[in-house]
């Protein structure tokens, strides 16, 4: 039996990628993960301290095994949450459209924490609870936006999307997109876990972004002094 470093066939082996889901407490991260991985929406809010999900998807004919790390957004879990960042290829940074604090914390809190623990990691900004917008044109806006290639904002009918709060101070699509550009996110997505709208699309786009990051490599030296990169 012989081994050739880096030459083994991996055609049947899934590509492994790690994605951390980050954002304020109660913004909807766990509900998003439950709908995507288990197919159900939890009606009762239960704060998450830490949970890891493994889920297989196919993106652009590639079999990907996603390691999805749910994190607690509360300040008292800052030290524990910091353990989640190692070997991360993409972060889904979330906010809720009914909480301006959660949007402001994207820049004021989370980007700084990300820089401290995994500077340079690829970011995807995700707006949650978009079912709270009951305007038909707004609900049609639950689609991914590739920030680097398409800065236009339109609905399925080709019309400009006008933010509407129906008496509530809901965050508009345009405000979310502006924040995504400000923090250098590669994608801006909107979804509703409750209605299961845009959920699969959000994780598909995050997986695409994670693929561009490449695998985390560890260099191991042999007795002869030569090195081999283990993916």
Curated annotation (Swiss-Prot):
- Mind listing the UniProt keywords for this protein, alphabetically? Cell membrane, GTP-binding, Lipoprotein, Membrane, Methylation, Nucleotide-binding, Prenylation
Q: What is its main location?
A: membrane
Per UniProt, GTP binds at 23-30, 70-74, 128-131
Organism the protein comes from: Saccharomyces cerevisiae (strain ATCC 204508 / S288c) (Baker's yeast)
What activity regulation does UniProt give? Activity is positively regulated by the GTPase activating protein (GAP) RGD1.
Family annotation (NCBIfam families): small_GTP
What are its GO biological-process terms?
A: actin filament organization; establishment or maintenance of actin cytoskeleton polarity; positive regulation of exocytosis; positive regulation of formin-nucleated actin cable assembly; regulation of actin cytoskeleton organization; signal transduction; small GTPase-mediated signal transduction
For this chain, one GO molecular function annotation is: protein kinase binding
The residue ranges flagged as biased composition, category Polar residues, are 139-150
Comp. bias (Low complexity): 151-165
InterPro entries membership? P-loop_NTPase (IPR027417), Small_GTP-bd (IPR005225), Small_GTPase (IPR001806), Small_GTPase_Rho (IPR003578)
Q: What is this protein called?
A: GTP-binding protein RHO3
> Can the keyword Cell membrane be found in this entry's annotation?
yes
